[in-house]
Amino acid sequence: TPKPSSAASDVYKRQFLWWGAVGGTAVWIGVIPFTGGLGTDDLLAFLLGVGVSGVLHVAYMAVLQRGYREGNLSTVYATARGTGPFLSVIVAILLFGERPSVLALVGVAAIIVGVVAIGLVDRGRAERQDRSLDLGLVFGLLTGVAIAIYTIWDAHAVRTWNLSPVAFMVGTMLLEIPFYSFGVRGRWAAVRTLGRTQWRRIVAFSILSPLSYILVLTAIQIAPVALVAPLREVSVVLVSLFGVFALKESRPGWRLAASAVVAGGIVLLAL
């Protein structure tokens, strides 16, 4: 059953996601004219690309939040962040005909293993001994599948139709707003309160979250998905290192070793 505190947390997350979509659209829409416009004259292709992407991203977020509600955060996060890149690599090889070198594939494997190890560092002994079905693991896997699906679709869209990453991101966020609006229906007073009290966090999120994916889309246009997808997970290492040196979190040896494995994988990709 869902955790008792999950209801209030879910409401907050939906409200924050609404502000993120609205704020991200407002921040980045003005950048479109300076970054190549839509990138294509085919308006139908643009609408199809962002329309499908918007639905996929909302579905991904819904599955992820359900996973956080049903299971341990570290389990869901590690499983999703390991499964997503792995499936993206497999599909990119099968559908896009990408052929990474053996060395690069070893690097990809190292990154995925290291990321999963970082995510599982805080799993309790009791959890590991529990033989019952781990819903966190199930939803982590489903989230990984969702990550792979939207990654492959977005790569196909920006490559095939030469769409501008900025315009694509803005279009996707714009289409997410109605979905998130449905999620916060009847709670608009609370949404406004959140906007007043958390505006600094919302502004930062509205700038940085879209920027991170715009950079991913830009990389996908010039590099194989099989290499870009795993490299997205470098942020997990940075957070882990911050936890070791700034927050003095437990099991620093494990965290540093896992981070070193990821770093080694990145080096192999660069060779």
Regions found by a protein language model. Give the residues of each.
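Hydrophobic/small/kink-forming positions within alpha-helical transmembrane segments
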Residues: 29, 54, 58-59, 82-90, ...
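Juxtamembrane helix-loop boundary signature in multi-pass membrane transporters
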Residues: 86-145, 155, 250-271
